[in-house]
Amino acid sequence: RWGEVANIKGEHIIGGKVIFMETKNGSRRVIPIAKALESLIKVKATGRLMNPSYAIVRSAIRTVRPDLPVGQSVHVLRHTFATHFMINGGNIITLQRILGHSTIQQTMTYAHFAPDYLQDAVRFNPVAELSRFCP
């Protein structure tokens, strides 16, 4: 989420992880990042790491994908990440935690581009077996 990224500080990036302190749903969230990415984005040890100008980020994204709806530039990156995460064999529960969703249903809307993986989530669901014991 743009608001979360805009507030990242150097002290929030520790050992290959980003700690989001101020999230949309109010809970702290930790996500893993590659060491190479950490060295690129952690340009200082403390304080804000970037100019939180949405217009600058939107402009950069628009040069790559100019047909995005207004207000959706950064948001589409979340969908793209979710899609590729699932296509690469990611776990829907892990994706839910990374995206900071409170329900799995929210996460499933993000992963709608990878229906085969969602079917696996249903097929391998151990709770589904419990339904045979319920009338």
Feature map (PLM): residue ranges:
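C-terminal secondary-structure termini that scaffold catalytic or DNA-interacting sites
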Residues: 125-135
